[in-house]
């Protein structure tokens, strides 16, 4: 079948069904509304997770197509968090008729611990509330699980992540 464990093969499903606290006053959050902000969000994500070189090139090569998809799909919303006017964190959410799925978020290392991610969770909660959704749901790995727990998310299930080595673009643990 070709299925192999992902680099981080275990995660938990988490849900937030009560309003999170606000982000700090020093953090401004805005919806990504321009191609430039979208490119900034890609760079933040890549740098935050230690990706560069080929990974960054591939992400930037897909950027225009992804930007057009984001612009034309109101169900997916991207946010940037700024401190002192500088983008330091990014996060995405997908809105469905029954809830909101948080799709990743990342904060540049120098800004960690300053509330940017907390502010992004609150922004996505506020958007969910505006749309009539009652909860936020996410898949959390080892890095994000304790952060999300501090923000009020609770664990609801265990997830084992497998990749199909035969699928285009699939990268397993041996791919580094």
What residues fall within each predicted segment?
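Conserved acetyl-CoA-binding loop-helix of GNAT-fold acetyltransferases
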Residues: 104-109, 113-126, 130, 145-146, ...
């Amino acid at each position: 079948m070709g299925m192999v464990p992902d680099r981080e093969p275990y995660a938990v499903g988490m849900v937030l069904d009560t309003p999170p606290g606000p982000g700090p006053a020093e953090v401004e959050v805005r919806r990504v509304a321009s191609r430039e902000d979208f490119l900034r969000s890609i760079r933040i994500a890549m740098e935050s997770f230690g990706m560069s070189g080929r990974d960054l090139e591939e992400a930037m090569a897909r950027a225009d197509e992804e930007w057009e998809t984001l612009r034309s799909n109101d169900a997916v919303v991207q946010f940037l968090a700024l401190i002192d006017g500088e983008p330091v964190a990014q996060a995405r959410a997908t809105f469905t008729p029954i809830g909101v799925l948080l799709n990743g978020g990342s904060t540049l290392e120098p800004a960690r611990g300053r509330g940017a991610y907390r502010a992004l969770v609150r922004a996505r909660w506020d958007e969910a509330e505006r749309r009539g959704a009652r909860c936020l749901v996410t898949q959390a790995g080892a890095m994000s699980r304790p952060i999300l727990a501090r923000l009020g998310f609770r664990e609801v299930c265990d997830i084992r992540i497998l990749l199909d080595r035969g699928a285009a673009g699939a990268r397993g643990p041996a791919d580094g």
